[in-house]
Regions:
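Amphipathic alpha-helical dimerization/coiled-coil segments
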Residues: 1-13, 30-34, 83-101
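Short, hydrophobic-biased segments on the C-terminal half of alpha helices
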Residues: 59-60
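Glycine-centered, phosphate/nucleic-acid-interacting loop/turn motifs that mediate DNA/RNA or nucleotide
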Residues: 66
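Short beta-strand "wing" residues that participate in macromolecule-binding interfaces
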Residues: 70
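N-terminal helix-turn-helix DNA-binding core of bacterial DNA-binding proteins
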Residues: 11-51, 73-85
């Protein structure tokens, strides 16, 4: 962890990197991106061969990391990409490109 970063920011990095560590969650983000940036939970689940609770858990982790947001429409949950956390991580990674050595 970078000592100059706030605890809140460090927690945000941790949540994003944890979410992105799983290949299925990365594929979910890519799938949503290539489907216009928004999909229902049911549409996402159909793209992956796994149990519904597993898909739901992946969506919860992505949402907790701030990478997806959802809104309810009737009985459906519509998930939308939220790239602000990715920008935060991009800036964190850019810091290392300027590091000495």
């Amino acid at each position: 962890m970078l000592e100059h970063e706030s605890k809140e920011r460090q927690d945000a990095y941790e949540a994003v990197f944890t979410a992105l560590a799983h290949p299925v969650r990365r594929r979910i983000l890519i799938t949503v991106y290539f489907n216009g940036g928004s999909m229902t939970a049911g549409q996402i689940a159909k793209k992956f061969e796994q149990a519904w609770p597993t898909t739901t858990r992946h969506l919860q982790v992505l949402e907790a990391a701030g990478l997806l947001r959802h809104r309810r429409q009737g009985r459906s949950r519509h998930y939308r990409l939220d790239c602000r956390r990715l920008e935060l991580v991009r800036d964190w990674l850019a810091w290392f490109s300027r590091a000495p050595g």
